[in-house]
């Protein structure tokens, strides 16, 4: 990575064919999952006319994802990771085919949608954990920051493209097209993934999966560094749940429908800018301190967001949150991968990803509870400033993370 540039260096895609294959597979997978994410709630709403039923499907899928992350972490530390990745992707694609066939029936089954949602949520997250655990072996630990930033850009770009494409498909061909193309895209991802080298795991004693998972929890709690990283990650994800208040806040700002879209686009845009300008982040000597400060700054941006007098200022605050949270997340990812023992990478990546899933759900629930007691403006500002106080306390308490120093890596990627 070029020390003189703040911009992200994409040369890793040229110099590491295995990472290029993962990049391509991940992008196709994100677009495929995005098509699914648009189709499922629309189909359930059309069948039941019940927002509760739509919410139930999201909750069930989220629960299956959480279990899949836990199981995937254990499997990724026990079995050859390439096989786990391929098995998970292929099995997930079978579930998409099931959704497509169900949608083509004269009377689609609601129960089938719920069950296949559980199936796909479980196997999709199982493969994600194995892929995360394999990344250090594919790019080298010295290139993890660069790989993480490129991955973040991939996720953001795919997250923008897939809903638009999904909406067009719904308008022109119905939900069956979304499911069919999601299945096709998932099986296409197997082609680049088949080119990956073997990804064996370090030798370790066979033990009960629950005991193996418990060992990961013990490691997390016993390590002030890794534990602090996981805690910060969960809090940042909780803060991002402020999006549930966008519709109510848009009414107070008297925003048009087109302008409301800018609220939803602001955080991804800020995160993309954060990833693009992360060129020198890998060379920071005190990544823990930068992580803590950027996290507190992101909370402050959320607190200020709702009390802005005009919506444009609110959008700027959200973009600032996206930028600062991207910096924090990139440092979390890199330190987690570099400071976790190889034989525990699968389980720790599973736990780290799971706290992202649960943090978002907890944040949304807390904001919903606050919204029942106070105005949307007060709810957003109280949650943001409350997180600022917690963040400042953690800045003092997490001494090992704050003082952590590293030798800047010398990348061979460019």
From Swiss-Prot:
GO terms, biological process: response to antibiotic
InterPro entries: Enterobactin_exp_EntS, MFS_dom, MFS_trans_sf, TM_effector
Similarity field: Belongs to the major facilitator superfamily. EntS (TC 2.A.1.38) family.
Protein name (Swiss-Prot/TrEMBL): Enterobactin exporter EntS
Key word Transmembrane present: yes
Gene: entS
Gene3D superfamilies in alphabetical order: MFS general substrate transporter like domains
Membrane topology classification: Multi-pass membrane protein
Transmembrane helix among keywords: yes
Originating organism: Salmonella typhimurium (strain LT2 / SGSC1412 / ATCC 700720)
Biological role: Component of an export pathway for enterobactin.
HAMAP family assigned to the protein according to its UniProt record, in alphabetical order: MFS_EntS
A Pfam family per the record: MFS_3
Residues on Cytoplasmic side: 1-21, 77-83, 131-156, 200-218, 278-287, 337-356, 400-414
Domain of life: Bacteria
Main location: membrane
Cystine crosslinks: none
NCBIfam families named in the record: PRK10489.1
Any one Gene Ontology cellular component term annotated for this protein: plasma membrane
């Amino acid at each position: 990575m070029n020390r003189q540039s703040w911009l992200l260096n994409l040369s890793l895609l040229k110099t590491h064919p295995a990472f290029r294959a993962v990049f391509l597979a991940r992008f196709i997978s994100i677009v495929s999952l995005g098509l699914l994410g648009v189709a499922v709630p629309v189909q359930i709403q059309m069948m039941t006319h019940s927002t509760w039923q739509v919410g139930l499907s999201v909750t069930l899928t989220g629960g299956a994802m959480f279990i899949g992350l836990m199981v995937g972490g254990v499997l990724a530390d026990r079995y050859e990771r390439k096989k786990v990745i391929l098995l998970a992707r292929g099995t997930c694609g079978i579930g998409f085919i099931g959704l497509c066939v169900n949608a083509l029936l004269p009377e689609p089954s609601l129960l089938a949608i719920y069950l296949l949602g559980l199936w796909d949520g479980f196997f999709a997250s199982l493969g994600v954990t194995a892929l995360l655990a394999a990344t250090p072996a594919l790019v080298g630990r010295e290139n993890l920051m660069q790989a993480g930033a490129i991955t973040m850009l991939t996720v953001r770009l795919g997250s923008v493209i897939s809903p638009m494409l999904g909406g067009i498909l719904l308008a022109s061909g119905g939900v069956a097209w979304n499911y069919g193309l999601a299945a096709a895209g998932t099986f296409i991802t197997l082609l680049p993934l088949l080119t990956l080298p073997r990804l064996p795991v370090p030798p370790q004693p066979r033990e009960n999966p629950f005991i193996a998972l418990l060992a990961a929890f013990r490691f997390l709690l016993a390590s002030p560094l890794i534990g602090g990283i996981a805690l910060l990650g969960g809090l940042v994800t909780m803060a991002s749940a402020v999006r549930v208040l966008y519709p109510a806040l848009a009414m107070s700002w008297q925003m048009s429908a087109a302008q409301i879209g800018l609220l939803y686009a602001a955080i991804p845009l800020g995160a993309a800018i954060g990833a693009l300008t992360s060129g020198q982040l890998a060379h920071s000597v005190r990544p823990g301190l930068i992580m803590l400060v950027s996290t507190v700054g992101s909370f402050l941006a959320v607190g200020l967001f709702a009390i802005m007098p005009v919506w444009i200022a609110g959008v700027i605050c959200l973009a600032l949150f996206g930028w600062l949270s991207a910096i924090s997340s990139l440092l979390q990812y890199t330190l987690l991968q570099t400071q976790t023992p190889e034989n525990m990478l699968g389980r720790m990546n599973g736990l780290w990803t799971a706290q992202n899933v649960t943090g978002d759900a907890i944040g949304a629930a807390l904001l919903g509870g606050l919204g029942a007691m106070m105005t949307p403006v007060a709810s957003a500002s109280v949650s943001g400033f409350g997180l600022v106080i917690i963040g400042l306390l953690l800045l003092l308490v997490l001494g090992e993370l704050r003082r952590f120093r590293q030798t800047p890596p010398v990348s061979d990627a460019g």
